[in-house]
Amino acid sequence: MLASKLDPFLKRFEELNSLLSSSDILNDISKMTTLSKEQKNLEPIVLKTKEYLKTLDNIEENKALLNDPELGELAKEELKTLEELKPKLEEEIKILLLPKDLNDERNIFLEIRAGTGGDEASLFVGDLVKAYARYAENRGYKLEIVSSSEGSVGGFKEIIMLVKGTGAYSRLKYEGGTHRVQRVPQTESQGRVHTSAITVAVMPEVDDIEIEINPNDLKVDVMRSSGHGGQSVNTTDSAVRITHIPTGIVVVNQDGKSQHKNKESAMKVLKARLYEMQENERLAKESEARKSQVGSGDRSERIRTYNFPQNRISDHRINLTLYRLDAIMQDGLFDEIIEPLITHHQAQALQEQNL
């Protein structure tokens, strides 16, 4: 029975309340921070549990009043409302009981690269960057460009952005993979539709303590920053290239105003890539049955098609098709795709957990 599964959460929450009011904990900042975080994480399930248990009590109380000559009719109406509320609360609680993705609340690095399609792919990277910027603004996230390489006719060959905001990873993690675009290039005189592709990688920003890097494993090169077309934009060696020798991962950063700033940003991206590599290795070891059917987030997995002539956007992971591509791109309305993906992921997880 669901109610019996919830009792440990209530007991632990009360225990935390007691601990956090004790003088021993109040004098230990580290311990207090850890316990406060646990309490905050438990609060949603505890509040929903209390609402659910109160609903169960109210159902029993109203059942007992059904034969009452004065209150029976009122109890019948109230019982109908409560019986409709009960399964909704149960579903909400089951979702809260699902194992949490530890990365969900993190900031993210969003890395977008032009793939097949040459200039057209670079232009679409630029369009997607603008759309993601509007999405970030809609959700109250802050977005900053970490590094970029412009395309020869506009857009970007590649770009890395840092998206800051609570829950950024929980939503944008669904963007990882290959995005295919079909549209008529401006240079196409006969109106033929061209197909190009770009890749998106979503990497959680990680703390220094989570990823330890041996300085001896790094090769750091400094060089002149270059602007569009290779033009030198300053007279100091401020651009930084860091190579992680064991993995061969290379990160270049030249967008900052100083060598120190560029090195700092490059190290953050390197740590995110190493963390992503570790996570992918961990996921690969899990059984296929436990992998979410929403997709792995692997940048080689084709997840979505943007068809401009048809004003169509299709997400292949859940067979979702919407004919409002223009509005989604113009206003950054990616939640119209992300919300169904989250719902699908939760349904799969509930099935796996037998909840």
Swiss-Prot record:
Modification N5-methylglutamine occurs at: Q231
Residue segments, region Disordered: 281-302
MF (Gene Ontology): translation release factor activity, codon specific
Transmembrane segments: none
Pfam family, one: PCRF
Keywords, alphabetical: Cytoplasm, Methylation, Protein biosynthesis
Superkingdom classification of source: Bacteria
Gene3D superfamilies registered for this protein in UniProt: 3.30.160.20, 3.30.70.1660, 6.10.140.1950
Function summary: Peptide chain release factor 1 directs the termination of translation in response to the peptide chain termination codons UAG and UAA.
PANTHER family attached to this UniProt entry: LD18447P
UniProt-recorded name of the protein: Peptide chain release factor 1
